[in-house]
Amino acid sequence: MARLLLAEDEEVLRMLVSDTLEDDGHEIDEACDGEEALNKIMAHDYDLIVLDYMMPVFTGLEVIVKVRAIPEKKHSMILMLSAKSQVSDQRAAMDAGADYFMAKPFSPIQLSEKIEEILK
């Protein structure tokens, strides 16, 4: 179906979400921090980039700002995931350039449904 990058520093959550999305037929690349995510974004084209807000090395916000500054990557679709669910956090993500925001906690099924909605 689609090629996605899942950048999430919580290993158990990353594995659970990745397995769910693979079961949906998606090809998933994984990153455990912002630097690894940025390197993969530079090396590949993704239908959707799913970023955790708070990650080591570069936060999700920092990754978004860097991606939006690269002409050939600036139109990448980005979904920000975050345990920081205040309106100000959502606004910060959208102001940085996220296309979508989803607050934690969520079930893998809820994320799967959100991704299907985005990719339509």
What are these model-derived regions, one by one?
Residues 30-48:
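Acidic, metal-coordinating helix/loop segments flanking the phosphotransfer/catalytic sites
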Residues 106-115:
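C-terminal output helix
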Residues 55:
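Receiver (REC) domain active-site loop signature in two-component systems and cognate sites
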Residues 8:
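Conserved acidic carboxylate
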Residues 15-23:
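Charged docking surfaces used in two-component/phosphorelay signaling
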